[in-house]
């Protein structure tokens, strides 16, 4: 077999030596920084606080400072900014004053993708899992892809990797419309839902138009892979104007599944594929019908790239997961007895509903105790009624205060308002937790043997899950 070669770097990047990242601790920023570091560029960066990703980049040779200062951009050739960074940031202003190019994260990702076979995964929900599955299957087939993913791939302990093959697999982020900077050869869209609406002026039509424009960035010989189960994607289908493959649960989809069965954390199903008479039997080491659809998208991509069925089946069965995507900490021995602890990144009602459905299907006999941290006041406001409906379905509910993600509080869109509304709804009596530090003591009285404890949200609740996995056992 011929050893794959690293794809060439864009010619214009040859003039670039040092690249500075403002907000380097973000998962998308840090992933790109690691790939560039491994390509031989000098990487520097700054952020407001240190985290595991920054520690990893430091160990790889990046120069990172905590806090922002104009002097940090001295000597750099280009500055990459996260969408979370304000325009008046002191480092950004200093770079512009020195006529140093300032580019958004997605533009740098587009440069990495430009001279490779770019595979971009977009969609409101399921991007990280689908991207991880595609990259993993390509790796299993010895295609050695480069990838940049919005979550830590457990098997390698990182969210990005520089490969020697021709493929680059990445998430395409619609939250700030930056995915419109990408020009992949193959694009996947998992679904389109109302989220990040502030970036689109609160106009769902504008959001749909952005997804359609994203697909129009494909070349005429490219390929769009879209989920036919999603009503919005069905609506957009006639306007795509590029080669299209569909996937879903309905028989009219090019790739469709049947006989879906879940046993605890594993899901089994069969897949029909165009041009194949036999059904492909798949065992996926993830729970839930939503993850089966994510895997189906990855199977469609893999099949189109000519990857053998055996490699697809082998990888999906052995998939070790992604950090904070239904991350199972296993059975924790508490004073009340053994409790199964699961942590998940879900922060939209549709994501919460999918996770709860997977839990009820895989562990129907367990009482479900949920600790939920809402993410952003705007999302809580915009999806308030949907949050009430979904969260009312659990057995025990603890509500943490909204994780603001830089937003100012909005009246009637905080956790107290959510708590009151769920109480009025009457199906569950939620507990408002105003101090996360005492939640371990609260759980001491609430938990029962055999419970499934789910921590869920996109803020800092993941750190709470890690602490609980230790502290609850310590109270035995």
UniProtKB/Swiss-Prot annotation:
Signal peptide residue numbers: none
Q: Which residues cross the membrane?
A: none
Which SUPFAM superfamilies does the record associate with it?
Answer: MurCD N-terminal domain, MurD-like peptide ligases, catalytic domain, MurD-like peptide ligases, peptide-binding domain
Query: Family assignment?
Result: Belongs to the MurCDEF family.
Instruction: Give the catalysed reaction(s), semicolon-separated.
Output: UDP-N-acetyl-alpha-D-muramate + L-alanine + ATP = UDP-N-acetyl-alpha-D-muramoyl-L-alanine + ADP + phosphate + H(+)
Swiss-Prot/TrEMBL keywords: ATP-binding, Cell cycle, Cell division, Cell shape, Cell wall biogenesis/degradation, Cytoplasm, Ligase, Nucleotide-binding, Peptidoglycan synthesis
Indicate which residues the UniProt annotation says bind ATP: 123-129
- Name the predominant localization: cytoplasm
What species is this protein from? Answer: Nitrosococcus oceani (strain ATCC 19707 / BCRC 17464 / JCM 30415 / NCIMB 11848 / C-107)
Task: Indicate whether Cell cycle appears among the record's keywords.
Answer: yes
> Its GO CC terms?
cytoplasm
Quote the function comment for this protein: Cell wall formation.
Listed under GO biological process in this entry are:
cell division; cell wall organization; peptidoglycan biosynthetic process; regulation of cell shape
Tell me which EC number(s) this protein carries: 6.3.2.8
Please spell out the taxonomic lineage of the organism that makes this protein.
Bacteria, Pseudomonadati, Pseudomonadota, Gammaproteobacteria, Chromatiales
Q: Name one Pfam family in it.
A: Mur_ligase_C
A single Gene Ontology molecular function, please?
A: UDP-N-acetylmuramate-L-alanine ligase activity
Give the pathway: Cell wall biogenesis; peptidoglycan biosynthesis
What top-tier enzyme class does this entry carry? ligase
Q: Identify this protein by name.
A: UDP-N-acetylmuramate--L-alanine ligase
Q: Which gene encodes it?
A: murC
Which cellular compartments is it found in? Cytoplasm
**Keyword flag Ligase:** yes
User: Superkingdom, according to UniProt?
Assistant: Bacteria
